[in-house]
């Protein structure tokens, strides 16, 4: 609460605190370890995907092979492993589809989100490495570089002018008075 009186502005605050107990009290390290290691929810409970939803998503062996290659995993898998991966990827795609379909605020369709979610090999190509000479040249050019986007102007800051004795360090003093 803020009050204005003859002595000026008075500010007073009140503190509100509420406590409630959730679950049993954890007394030992073993109790804490067990509580942290036990799952409290799963995607299967949140979204029950039926066979109709799973069949609406088409995942081929070619897609699984491509995902494995992009992930740098071994592509030599058994038919059982492939079936398991197809099932897992289908469930994930049904989950993502569920998120988009139930988003009432968004009028966009799933295909319009390609700008946000993309996997292009060129995104992961590193640039050319710098040589020592190039790095030293960049360091030498640094004092002359001015970035107007940061509000810098040419000659706006010079460390040598801050110290009247022109020593290679700066001394900052507060204003007297």
Swiss-Prot record:
- Keywords assigned: ATP-binding, Ligase, Membrane, Mitochondrion, Mitochondrion inner membrane, Nucleotide-binding, Protein biosynthesis, Transit peptide
CC annotations in GO:
glutamyl-tRNA(Gln) amidotransferase complex; mitochondrial inner membrane
Note whether Oxidoreductase occurs among the keywords.
no
Disordered: annotated span: 148-177
InterPro entries named among the record's database cross-references? GatF (IPR027499)
Q: Which residues are the transit peptide here?
A: 1-16
Q: Where are the transmembrane segments?
A: none
Q: Where is the composition biased (Polar residues)?
A: 153-164
UniProt main location, coarse = mitochondrion
Which reaction is the catalytic activity of this chain? L-glutamyl-tRNA(Gln) + L-glutamine + ATP + H2O = L-glutaminyl-tRNA(Gln) + L-glutamate + ADP + phosphate + H(+)
Q: Does the keyword Ligase apply?
A: yes
Q: What is its EC number?
A: 6.3.5.-
Annotated membrane topology is:
Peripheral membrane protein
The places in or outside the cell where this protein is found are: Mitochondrion inner membrane
Alphabetical GO biological process terms: glutaminyl-tRNAGln biosynthesis via transamidation; mitochondrial translation
Example GO molecular function: ATP binding
Q: Where on the tree of life does the source sit, at the highest rank? A: Eukaryota
The UniProt function text for this chain reads: Allows the formation of correctly charged Gln-tRNA(Gln) through the transamidation of misacylated Glu-tRNA(Gln) in the mitochondria. The reaction takes place in the presence of glutamine and ATP through an activated gamma-phospho-Glu-tRNA(Gln). Required for proper protein synthesis within the mitochondrion.
Q: How does it assemble?
A: Subunit of the heterotrimeric GatFAB amidotransferase (AdT) complex, composed of A, B and F subunits.
Q: Describe the family membership recorded for this protein in Swiss-Prot or TrEMBL.
A: Belongs to the GatF family.
**Protein name, UniProt field:** Glutamyl-tRNA(Gln) amidotransferase subunit F, mitochondrial
